[in-house]
Amino acid sequence: MRQLKREVKIGNVTIGGKNPVAVQTMLNVPVEDIEGNVAQAKRCEAAGCQILCVTCPSPADAKCIEAVKNAVNIPIVADIHFDYKAALACADVGVDKIRINPGNIGDDDRVKAVVDACQRKNIPIRIGVNGGSLEKHILAKYGAPTPEAMVESALYHVRLLEKFDFNNIVISIKNSNVPRMMEAYRQLSAVTDYPLHVGVTEAGTYQMGLLKSGMGIGGMLLEGIGDTIRVSLAAEPEKEVEAGYNILRAVGFPVAGPEVITCPTCGRTQYPCTEIANEVEKRLQGCKKSIKVAVMGCVVNGPGEAREADIGIAGGKGEAVLFIHGKPIKKLTGDNILDQFMDEIYKL
């Protein structure tokens, strides 16, 4: 069962409570390239991104935040490290949320300056703890970025913001070690009702990043923890968005758009099952209809294994059996089985 947290409004998206888990990504174009950031932001929005993070290393870079915000209709988060004045500049241009890293934002007076700016404009703050940049005194206490160390860092800054009479808060507590990250989120979720942004940081190259994020983010969601997610990949941010939705699908969250399933094939396969599955998925990109499509390798187990699919085919030599909701309907034959199958999908 999902652990319900308090609601926080980020621009036109509300997280927490019973609201859907929001998928987030972060632009990776150099901040000086405003045109490139705007173009990438538009691609992320088209891919379905719901919350978009943009780095802001200095106050002058707030102009990039402003340009991106004016170009898209999704909330923009300013990612702030070291320079608290960058956060102040982003608040001035109307950013929708500010992320601060407790490990490098500076002393309490600087945090208060950020809080005051956000309070005036009703801008939420994400306390973004990262296992790679914990405060020195906390690392000295625990000897490593343990779950307990990360939770202590997060809660200290939560209490600090609360001391300044600010509770418009989101928390993340990321680590590159999946078991450590998961335990940290468990401990944190048990002691706070602020919404949680879940992710595995520095997850690695594309393939390993997918695996670690699938395990870490998916595992947390299955335990009912998580209100917004980001899949951190060494790839274009649009790929992070796609992966985020796939994780939500995999753990049973309702997601708009088709899901294509296929079997791994074996020696019984007599038609290009994998190629057809990949092409079906490609052709259905951008489709918002929530359907499950199955492309199975043979008629022995195909219809049974995919009985929960809305529509599917199970192939043989030069033909494929079309089935809908697990029931065989007719045979597709000839050299254009794929096109015939797509026609049937579009009829649904």
Map each language-model feature to its residues:
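Active-site mouth loops of central-metabolism enzymes
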Residues: 18-36, 55, 74-82, 138-151, ...
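Catalytic alpha/beta core domains of metabolic enzymes, predominantly
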Residues: 130-133, 138-285
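Hydrophobic or amphipathic alpha-helical targeting/insertion segments
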Residues: 85-126
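Glycine-enriched alpha-helix->loop->beta-strand junction motifs that scaffold or abut catalytic
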Residues: 71-74, 92-98, 119-122, 189-195, ...
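Glycine-rich, proline-tolerant flexible connector loops at the mouths of alpha/beta enzymes
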Residues: 34, 45-69, 99-107, 169-178
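Hydrophobic faces of well-ordered beta-strands that scaffold small-molecule active sites
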Residues: 21-27, 52-54, 76-80, 98-100, ...
